[in-house]
């Protein structure tokens, strides 16, 4: 009996390996448009606003701006937090609001201006977060300043800046003065292109009040924004994952307030709501000594959030911004203290990003919502150890592999077109059970524009373990040209990967100037082979490429 069972296992193993040994196929049909390639990826954010105007912060922002053909939106916490502007992990401050001995307001926009000037100089746009509570306005100000250290309990950061104001009218005047100052400094047309938002994750300890107190604060804030600039855009509430009861219920209550309830300021029904925002995070963990990602958790948050917004007929066409959209929830928790975050330096992060963004678009199509943007909550951490494992796009001025996925996205525009593949997981399968089968998700996202087309490919699996490279047979159908120029780009262990180069150097803690130059070069998006001009036969091209596990490729066509 044991021998029979063993034989069955062997047969099943050989059958599964035989299935995987088949070539992966991807077929792109450029005549089948499925939606717009909305640049939802061109949104970024971070906790520490003072990094914005520091050396590596400015360098990275310049690179992000350069990779995008459209203005990039940037969201930062702590824009109204009290302090001297000294940066720290999960902390930042601007001292925008203080009071004199008689309780009169003192406005100082010096640091806020440094932050926004840095964006505007690069053609970027603020997703301007109204928060957090200045010390002089907090209803429970002490203690105020926190000193977060990786490995420390996350709850230690929730201090006096989380609480409602002791005077809502003073708060409203602060918001009014900020928007008015912004218009005076940058011009009405520029500020009309921004998005103003209130707070962050108010269903969590980030907000020390109730849901109704948040709605009250929103009404005061929205009224102040619109008094300063009637054409300004304001939204919220940036709750945590809507698939969870806490986030989902808060989102529903807030949307009901904005569409059906009495406004705390005007006494009328409803409140301005130019966009809806919620957050979505994955959930990596350690399994048998390796990192196992969970993309499904993140996609369920997105799907549920879309569904909740779509359930309000008044919000049918309202833009949706996923205000934080990431593989997990703590950017400042490195892999030394949180080993499940060891995916961040290499190709797991880049392949996850490619595969997950494609599913965000698919879920938006499914729910028929206006998907505007998805903020990648990842930036840089100034003067920290090399490749410490923070969730960042660069380390000490050197780009990580994940940034090159966004460089690829920057070359995709126009309409998304149909992609089918024999190893490509359906979007709902990834949402419901992530990528856990014996075979990887070998998929694609394709676009077509005037005179150009692009196909992004990935070889992704939740398990961060070594695997077989895939041979991918790529069929491109209904190409509207006789001849095309084809260029390929690649992110894997040998291409566009500063982390692997750093490890080959011996993982230096203080690289030399020569090594840094080499790392900077390795951090750029690399071509895969030479560009070539090819004749299209009957509107079709067929060619094969090899894609390593966790590899991401981009094929561009020009005619």
Label for each model-derived stretch:
Residues 194-200, 323:
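Short, conserved phosphate-binding/catalytic loop or strand-edge motifs used
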Residues 51, 80-83, 135, 199-205, ...:
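Conserved radical SAM core fold
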């Amino acid at each position: 009996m044991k021998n029979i069972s063993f034989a069955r296992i062997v047969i099943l193993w050989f059958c599964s390996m035989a299935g995987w040994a088949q070539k992966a196929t991807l077929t792109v049909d450029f005549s089948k448009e499925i939606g717009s390639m909305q640049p939802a990826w061109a949104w970024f954010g971070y906790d520490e606003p003072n990094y914005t105007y520091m050396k590596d912060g400015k360098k990275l922002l310049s690179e992000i701006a350069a990779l995008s053909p459209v203005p990039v939106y940037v969201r930062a916490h702590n824009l109204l937090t009290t302090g001297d502007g000294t940066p720290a992990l999960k902390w930042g401050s601007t001292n925008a609001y203080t009071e004199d001995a008689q309780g009169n307001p003192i406005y100082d926009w010096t640091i806020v201006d440094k932050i926004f000037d840095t964006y505007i100089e690069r053609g970027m746009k603020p997703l301007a977060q109204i928060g957090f509570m200045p010390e002089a306005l907090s209803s429970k100000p002490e203690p105020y300043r926190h000193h977060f250290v990786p490995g420390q309990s996350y709850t230690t950061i929730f201090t006096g800046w989380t609480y409602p104001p002791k005077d809502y009218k003073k708060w409203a005047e602060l918001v009014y003065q900020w928007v008015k100052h912004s218009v005076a400094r940058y011009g009405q047309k520029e500020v009309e292109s921004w998005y103003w938002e209130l707070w962050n994750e108010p269903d969590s300890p980030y907000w020390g009040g109730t849901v109704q107190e948040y709605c009250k604060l929103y009404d005061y804030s929205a009224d102040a924004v619109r008094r300063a600039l009637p054409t300004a855009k304001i939204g919220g509430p940036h709750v945590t994952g809507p698939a969870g009861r806490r986030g989902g219920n808060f989102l529903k209550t807030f949307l009901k307030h904005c569409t059906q309830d009495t406004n705390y300021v005007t006494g009328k029904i409803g409140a301005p709501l130019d966009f809806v925002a919620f957050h979505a995070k994955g959930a990596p963990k350690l399994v048998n000594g390796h990192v196992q990602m969970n993309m499904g958790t993140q996609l369920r948050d997105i799907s549920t959030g879309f569904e909740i917004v779509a359930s309000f007929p008044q919000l049918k066409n309202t833009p949706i911004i996923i205000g934080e959209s990431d593989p997990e929830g703590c950017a400042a928790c490195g892999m030394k203290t949180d080993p499940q975050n060891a995916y961040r330096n290499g190709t797991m992060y880049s392949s996850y990003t490619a595969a997950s963004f494609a599913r965000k678009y698919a879920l938006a199509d499914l729910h028929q919502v206006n998907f505007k943007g998805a903020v990648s909550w990842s930036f840089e951490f100034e003067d920290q150890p090399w490749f410490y494992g923070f969730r960042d796009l660069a380390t000490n001025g050197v780009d990580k592999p994940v940034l090159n996925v966004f460089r690829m996205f920057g070359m995709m525009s126009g309409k998304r077109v149909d992609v089918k593949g024999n190893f490509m997981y359906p979007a709902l399968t990834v949402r419901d059970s992530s990528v856990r089968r014996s075979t990887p998700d070998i998929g694609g996202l394709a676009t077509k524009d005037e005179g150009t087309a692009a196909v992004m490919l990935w070889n992704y699996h939740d398990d961060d373990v070594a695997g077989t490279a895939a041979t991918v047979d790529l069929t491109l159908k209904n190409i509207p040209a006789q001849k095309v120029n084809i260029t390929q780009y690649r992110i894997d262990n040998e291409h566009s990967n500063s982390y692997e180069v750093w490890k080959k150097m011996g993982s230096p803690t203080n690289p030399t100037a020569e090594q840094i130059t080499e790392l900077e070069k390795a951090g750029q998006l690399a071509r895969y082979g030479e560009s070539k001009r090819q004749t299209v036969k009957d509107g079709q091209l067929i060619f094969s490429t090899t894609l390593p596990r966790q590899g991401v490729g981009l094929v561009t066509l020009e005619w």
